Amino acid sequence: MRSDMNNTHPAIPRQAPANALNTSTIQPGAAPQQSMIRHIIAIDPDVDRSGVAFLHLPSRELHCEAKTFPELIDDLHATKQATDALGEPLIVIVEAGWLNRSNWHVQAGDSRRKAAAIGRAAGRNHEVGRKIVEMARHMGIETVEQRPLQKCWRGPDGKITAAELAQFTGYTRRTSQDMRDAALLAWVHAGLPIRI
């Protein structure tokens, strides 16, 4: 655990509101009711730096970061402690490309070597995602393995652009593609409107 880390995250309020909900009624493995969720952490797994989005639902405050695996696990632990102290529900959404039959981005003209490299990279990312899910569940955090969302945006390969994300979330800080994908995952899971 990093020594400079405190028990709160920028996307988590420091004091519990008067109407804070108690999570003691949520059964392990059962999906919590959408109205109860107050904090969503969405993760787009990557071998080097995963895209992570922290969404506080009551305020719609969104915070995006890129984290290495150890940093991410430390943040999950700290956020779990902070939300438990506030008595507020937390859920983690992990993009689970391994649930699709094929999530490779191979073009028709790619060589066998390139196709193998793409498959190897996808497999490594999938394993990171599985380990994130395993660690989050080990910490007692409600965790959802989410199939990748449909790619219907203006960016390369149908991925969401920074401008598109800013239009409906208001988040204008610099982001990587993994961070934007995580933010979109959190926003969609929360059922918040997407207007472009």
Enumerate the predicted regions with their spans.
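Phosphate- and other anionic-substrate recognition elements at nucleic-acid/protein interfaces
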Residues: 2-196
